[in-house]
């Protein structure tokens, strides 16, 4: 009654999935899972994009005001972005343009599925806290790309789950990572949400 909105988060764990059916951009075991994921082939990648877009369609049909795409914290979409987990040499890996193809295709497909007026939030990893993570220039570039393909709001993702630096424990000071969100101000014209120990 107060005018609030509710969005459903769409998350694919990728190599973090606790299952022998886990899939990822490359067959690399995560340090926080005992399972080695299978590398997605072209058909598998297309199926993942279609499934995520269908999830957005179902969220809209169920009455949600929007969706948040989990593109951070080391989950599947984030795994495509960085060399740490993406060792592919096809059009989904190698150059940064190729590595961002998966998240961009996800957003484009969702926008096509839900229409131009539906809320899309993208949780973008602003700081990975792992070896071979995204550079700041890459983060800014992807944020701008996300805005250009129809994202309405960027939510700040801080650190991968396998990172050795705590980000949400009660020992972490309040607003400890809000400086990273502030650093992105001015780079995009859409709203940015700060997160972690707020």
Language-model features and meaning:
Residues 1-198:
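Flavin-dependent oxidoreductase catalytic cores
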